[in-house]
Amino acid sequence: MATAEIEEIPALLKPGQTVAGLDLGTKTIGLAVSDLGLSFAHPRPVIKRVKFTIDAQVLLKALETDKVGVIVIGLPMNMDGTAGPRVQATRAFVRTMQPLTDLPFVFWDERLSTVAAERALIGMDVSRGKRADRIDSAAAAFILQGALDRLHMMRRNDYDAG
């Protein structure tokens, strides 16, 4: 499967699978993984980018280890809602990954995710040096948590309507 919509995630997951969040940078790939209840995003170590084949291999191994069934990837939109300069690179990354995995990708607007992640790390009194190492995975967790919160709201609305 190529890409999916956020609303499709529950139907795509098999029992025991999690959801991953990715923050794609030029030097690193931030990674976060949900719990089985799809309530909380947990940052994982960043993946240092080398070249695509190595990056993909490391990423796919991490996704397999965490029993990931769906990947939510941040789409770097501009504040006015238009596609930012990194949107094309993100879409190209997904297109290049698709032949390597059956996992579906869900694009998620990541506006201000890095800013929010940095503020959270500052709030936790993480030193500047350690923040640089953790920012991309913290941003991935922020992206994934936004998607998980949306899923939770959808379930709640379905429950209230039923």
Swiss-Prot record:
Pfam families for the chain: RuvX
Keywords, alphabetical: Cytoplasm, Hydrolase, Nuclease, Ribosome biogenesis
InterPro entries: RNaseH-like_sf, YqgF, YqgF/RNaseH-like_dom, YqgF/RNaseH-like_dom_sf
Main location (coarse class): cytoplasm
Entry's Gene Ontology BP terms: rRNA 5'-end processing
Enzyme Commission code(s) on record: 3.1.-.-
Subcellular location: Cytoplasm
Cleavable signal peptide: none
Family designation: Belongs to the YqgF nuclease family.
PANTHER family named in the record: POLYNUCLEOTIDYL TRANSFERASE, RIBONUCLEASE H-LIKE SUPERFAMILY PROTEIN
Function, as annotated: Could be a nuclease involved in processing of the 5'-end of pre-16S rRNA.
Protein name per the record: Putative pre-16S rRNA nuclease
Species for this entry: Brucella canis (strain ATCC 23365 / NCTC 10854 / RM-666)
